[in-house]
Structure formats: structure tokens, C-alpha cells
């Protein structure tokens, strides 16, 4: 049985839709759903064979190969990686303030640190176990929201005094002119060497499911919206902001992200990307 991880956010429901609804037949696979940080722990502990993980976790873990042609990437605005606050109006207002960071994120937590350091903004970072923005703002001046929590927060903007002071995808785009790669699909190196045909099989199914999703984005957005209690039209807009390919432009952006992380002291060494080669 192949153990396949899945991020428990709407942005991962989309590329898995064809697989999970038996549109893309798949056999001898167990899908294990969790948040990105926990998935990284599971694949590191050999509890998963293949999984999406926060992109920043790739250089922090050993003996992983990247699967080609699939990622979770934004071209600009993300709508699901946000800094929100009640009283503050911009990232510059965070200077000397406290920013709550959910423990379920790694890439976004690194990205906000890079953005603030590059802007010369220094604040206090407060790890938070909960994801409710109201709880986070009781102990901090601003909150980093990711995934479905961010989407739900946007839906409530007109009903509360909560404000989005930054969309990190847009901030990264403004700083670098590049896409932002949030998640990668990886396989344990020893597993790939022992069972290359199984990895090839899963990759093929993932890419077919991803392609099905792109061809049926409106239909799937309606269904995911109902499941997540998010307006269907907004869900369609959200899914259109994301890119699930992993082309050369995305690879270049990922390398830039790792370079900045190292410059900011958030990575210890330079990163060498290793890919699973189809047909090995």
C-alpha cells in the first residue's frame, strides 16, 4: 500500500478531486490528510512515502526527491496567505509589534520573516496553536493566516473591523517579480529507488487529477465551497489565483526563495534541488 499525504486545505482538495471522487482510478493507495508541517514530520519519520510538504521544509529534511510538474504556487495574490489586523494598516506598522504565527505553517512563516527583514521591519513573533484570527488577535497585534482560515477571514471582512494588511504572494511578487512556491510534492529517496514504478504511478495519477481539476474548475469550486462553507464564486476566484504546475519559472522562484532564506539566516546552507526522474 502506497502512503500518500494530502494537505487538509481547499488548495489541496482541488488537485486531489479527481482521485478522491474515483474519476481518476487509483489502487493500493492510502491518503493521509494533515497540515503541511505535520506531513513533513510524517515523511521524515517514514510514515508517508509521497506527500506535499511546505516548500521550506525540503532543504530542512534529508533524502527527499521532488516530484516534477506539480506544486502549489501563486502568480501574485493568493487570498490564502495573509497578514490581518484590527488596528494596523500596513506591514510597516508591525515595527515593534507582535505578529502571531500558526504552528501549522513553515513556508509562510519563513516568507513573512524574509519580507519584513528585507524591508527593515522588526517585530516579535508569537507561535500560536490555534487558527482562529479572533483568538490570535487577543495576544498579538496582527496574525498570519493561511489556508482555509485565511479564506474564511476574507469572507468576514465586511462584518468585522478586521483588515488584510498584506497578501504575502503579492508582497513577494512586488519584491522579486516572481511566483511564490508554497508546497512541493516529494518522495523519500530510498522509496523511489526501491519502487520507481510506484512513484511513477502516483505521479501520473496526480497529474491526471490536476489536469481534470483545471478542466472542471467551476464545478469543483462549487463542491469545495459547500464542503468548506465558502461562497462558490469566491472559491472559483481563489482557485484561479493558484498554479499547480512546476515549470522552470517556478523552479527559479523557489531557488530565489531559498537564497533569501539563507541570506536572512533562516536556512543554514545553499539548497541543491533533486528531482525524481520519470522513467528511471
Where are the language model's segments positioned?
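Long, low-complexity C-terminal extensions of enzymes
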Residues: 251, 259-280
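Hydrophobic residues within well-ordered alpha-helices
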Residues: 43-44, 135-137, 261
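A local structural motif
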Residues: 23-32, 119-129, 266-273
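Pocket-lining segment of extracytoplasmic ligand-binding domains
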Residues: 129-220
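Bilobed "Venus flytrap"/periplasmic-binding protein-like clamshell domains
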Residues: 2-21, 80-141, 148-152, 252
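A structural signal for short loop-to-beta-strand junctions that line the ligand-binding cleft
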Residues: 65-73
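Beta->alpha turn/N-cap motifs
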Residues: 10-11, 35-36, 46-60, 70, ...
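Secondary-structure end/capping motifs
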Residues: 193-260
